[in-house]
């Protein structure tokens, strides 16, 4: 285990992070249900939860990365105009490779880019670009797409929000174009309702 992964592991099991996350969930729920933002984070809590999210976004595992994304999502409604939030959201969403959310969460990414983040963003936007499209895969989507390219048979599942149909569309386009349509493609879906998504 690397030093960074041990730091991520410590953060995931830190009771203080769990306490901050529960407070953010309550804050978000009150804001959503009652339209009142009556639960405040003190400056230390705000700084700490952003630092936790930054550490977790550097994880190679899904649990840490998901928790970082959750923290940014919970903070968004209350802090979206805050410069510090913009800086951390830019960094975290870039590390997660979530460029669709980045364009929504951060108004002007160039204003909050550091050299490290600008370079990472450029590399990911170049390498993880969807073939024959201007969109960019998220990190897990890109890993799956690359695995599909190197496999003769492949089976996978993922949550609704993962973008399975999006990946399959890109992969089928890749096969038709790059392999000149010489491969056969069979897509099995579990229900009739999903047939429309892959046709």
Regions found by a protein language model. Name each.
Residues 1-199:
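N-terminal helicase ATP-binding lobe
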């Amino acid at each position: 285990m690397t030093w960074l992964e041990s730091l991520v592991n410590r953060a995931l099991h830190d009771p203080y992070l769990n306490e901050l996350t529960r407070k953010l969930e309550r804050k978000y729920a009150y804001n959503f249900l009652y339209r009142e933002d009556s639960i405040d984070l003190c400056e230390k809590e705000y700084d700490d939860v952003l630092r936790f999210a930054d550490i977790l976004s550097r994880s190679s595992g899904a649990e840490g990365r998901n928790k970082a994304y959750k923290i940014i999502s919970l903070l968004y409604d209350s802090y979206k105009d805050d410069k510090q939030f913009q800086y951390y959201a830019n960094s975290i969403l870039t590390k997660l490779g979530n460029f669709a959310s980045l364009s929504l969460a951060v108004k002007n990414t160039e204003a909050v880019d550091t050299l490290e983040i600008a370079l990472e963003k450029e590399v990911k936007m170049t390498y993880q670009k969807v073939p024959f499209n201007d969109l960019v895969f998220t990190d897990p989507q890109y890993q799956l797409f690359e695995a599909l390219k190197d496999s003769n048979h492949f089976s996978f599942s993922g949550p609704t929000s993962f973008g399975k149909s999006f990946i399959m569309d890109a992969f089928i386009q890749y096969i038709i174009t790059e392999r000149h349509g010489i491969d056969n493609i069979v897509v099995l879906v579990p229900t009739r309702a999903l047939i429309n998504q892959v046709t």
